Design a protein with these regions (language model features):
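Canonical Radical SAM [4Fe-4S] cluster-binding loop centered on the CxxxCxxC motif
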Residues: 1-32
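Radical SAM/AdoMet-radical enzyme domain recognition
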Residues: 31-50, 59-183
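Structural recognition of alpha->loop->beta junctions
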Residues: 92-108, 168-177, 243-273, 282
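A structural motif corresponding to the C-terminal lobe/cap of the Radical SAM core domain
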Residues: 191-217, 246-250, 255-264, 316-318
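Flexible mid-to-C-terminal extensions adjoining Fe-S/redox cofactors in radical SAM and related proteins
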Residues: 235, 248-318
Length: 318
């Protein structure tokens, strides 16, 4: 299960899906409610929790809540962060001592002019994030963070051509687990084609990255938000396209159903929902013509905001 602690953040990513709540300075979920959600889902049998934001590391009670989760018996405790706070090794040590076993960092580019200048709008941000990764990897080498350190970049037009360099740069640091998330048109770029490539444009780039990984890098690599039928747009043989799509694009395999507790929109209690169901039923679209596809049951289509910009004509039953 995952707990969204609130939407406040120390970055200003232009494509942030939470930008409206972030900029409205909506309050954090009180720690007693976070603990209540941990109690509830522990009783339901959950032993894995992820803390999300906003930016969890600026939540004043994160260490307290991580320690509470460990005390209850959660064995996998993850924090999904933009990574900047981890440049402070003392904070990193405090987090793992509290009980964190995994950290995922949202670093979108290895180039300062893109990461700092175009995306997060924070000068010097990338250098802090890279220093933070090195700190986390050093702790992992000491036997901490048993569930790993990973990256969670958004793939957009500004980063599309730099993916190979991104993989090489961060694999050289020691990262072995990367999940690219195809941009969900949101925030200030919700309808901006300068940021949101079509699958037809993106898939040849993605295919080259997958082949690079197969032949040379051997990373634990996956792509979210890319329907498997999009692989046919990459210009590959059907057999190779099927192999790569099954290995790298199957969200049902690497993104199983998970419960989410989030700050309330109205009222005093956190909202609870299953993210995959909410995403499929409220945020994404499929064509009626998709029904014959052999992947129909495991595919949730494309973001509605993507369809508003690029349509649904790229979808085709496999």
């Amino acid at each position: 299960m995952e707990i969204c602690l609130g939407k406040l953040c120390n970055n200003r990513c232009v494509f942030c899906m939470s930008s409206a709540d972030r900029d409205a300075h909506r309050p954090w979920l009180p720690p007693e409610q976070v603990k209540g959600e941990l109690d509830h889902f522990h009783r339901e049998g959950s032993r894995s929790v992820g803390f999300l934001g906003g930016e969890p590391t600026v939540y004043p009670h994160l260490l307290e809540c991580v320690a509470y989760a460990r005390g209850l018996g959660y064995t996998r405790i993850a924090v999904c962060s933009n990574g900047a706070r981890f440049s402070d090794m003392a904070y990193c040590r405090a987090l793992v001592e509290a009980g964190a076993t995994r950290v995922t960092a949202s670093i979108h580019s290895h180039k300062p002019k893109v990461e700092d200048g175009l995306i997060t709008k924070i000068p010097g941000n990338l250098a802090k994030k890279v220093a933070g990764l090195r700190n986390l990897l050093a702790l992992a080498a000491e036997g901490e963070l048993k569930d790993g350190v990973s990256l969670n970049p958004v793939l957009c037009r500004k980063t599309l051509s730099g993916m190979a360099g991104y993989l090489r740069y961060f694999s050289a640091i020691g990262i072995r687990d990367i999940r690219f998330n195809y941009i969900w048109p949101s925030g200030s770029v919700i309808d901006d084609p300068e940021w949101i490539p079509s699958y037809r444009e993106a898939m040849p780039h993605i295919a080259r990255i997958l082949i690079l990984n197969e032949r040379r890098l051997g990373l634990r690599l996956s792509f979210g938000g890319v329907p498997r039928c999009a692989m046919r747009l990459a210009g590959l043989s059907p057999r190779l396209a099927d192999h790569l799509a099954a290995k790298y694009l199957d969200e049902s395999a690497f993104d199983p159903d998970n419960d989410v507790a989030a700050p309330p929109e109205e009222g005093a209690l956190p909202r609870r929902f299953v993210w995959q169901e909410h995403k499929r039923d409220n945020l994404k679209l499929r064509e009626e013509s998709c029904r014959p596809c052999r992947h129909y049951e495991s595919c949730d289509g494309v973001w509605k905001t993507y369809a508003s910009l690029h349509g649904l004509g790229e979808l085709e039953p496999v």
